Amino acid sequence: MTTLMETRGATPTSGTTLRALTALEARRYARHPLFLVGVALLIWQVIVISQDAARAADGVSTTLVDVAIYPAFTLGLLGVFVGVHLTRSMARSREPIEASPTDGVNRVAAMCLACLVPGVVALVWFAWAYAVTAVWPLPATAMPSSSVAAIRGAGIVCAVGGPLFGVMVGRWTRFPGAGLLAAFVLFGWVMLSTGALAMSATRMSTLAHVWAPFVGWHSSDSVTGEAPWIAGGSPVWHLAYITALCGLAATAAMLHDAWGTQRARLIRVFVLVSVLALASLALAVAADPTRVPL
């Protein structure tokens, strides 16, 4: 009996195993060449924009309201490839944890948690965006500060969401080029929604704009960029919507390896998060479609 109790006590708990797996996957993510390329590109953009802001005679450009595209591309879109590659190569990193009992769902959950690595980098970028506008303030605008924060905060969510989408694709597909196809689908989805900015300001055009996982809010009626404006809709609720999309991607990825009651529980979570995503999208569209001049 004593031996049995000692054996049980020596067995790692599920939480301990998940932490060990997450640390392992986070290290793999942080060392991935494409992630490092994305970080380098983001740093380069930060340097260029900071120099432009310092040289500007009339203050910071209003386009700095809508700069989330930088982490969304360098960490999010490139992160799709990272997520697919690391998910498919998980088998190679099993050796260090062979002594720890685990299952496929735990391993995928750890991979999803590792996608917070680019989110941390994007969080540093978020702080930089506010530091720049604190030193060189933006021109006065009617846009509330919460909307500005939500537009910029989307960069953090996209930096995590792209890799999560890659993890999901990596679990459910096996054909070569799946990562490239997934990135192309995301890019096309965003480009399709951008076309709605050329439409008149209505709730239908707002829906066509904000249903994408990343949207550009800043535009102008002039080809020279004069008289810029921010598109209608609610950036805050759009942020909630894309956060829910991240939850859907993570849940769908874990569903691949789940069985029995675990699978049933994940399906319930998927349905609940789907409802939250649709509700957030509806609230984003329900906001005033009028464009806010900058």
Where are these regions (language model features)?
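Cytoplasmic juxtamembrane interface segments
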Residues: G9-T16, H85-E98, G155, A159-W189
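Hydrophobic alpha-helical transmembrane segments
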Residues: M1-S89, I242-L294
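Alpha-helix N-cap/helix-start motif at helix boundaries, enriched for small hydrophobics
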Residues: N106-A110
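Transmembrane helix segments
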Residues: G177-A208
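Membrane-embedded alpha-helical segments of integral membrane proteins
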Residues: A198-D257
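Short helix-to-coil transition segments within interhelical loops
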Residues: I97-V105
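Secretory targeting signals
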Residues: V46-L78, V82-G83, C112-L180
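Aromatic-anchored segments of alpha-helical transmembrane domains
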Residues: L42-S50, L123-V124, W128, F184-A196, ...
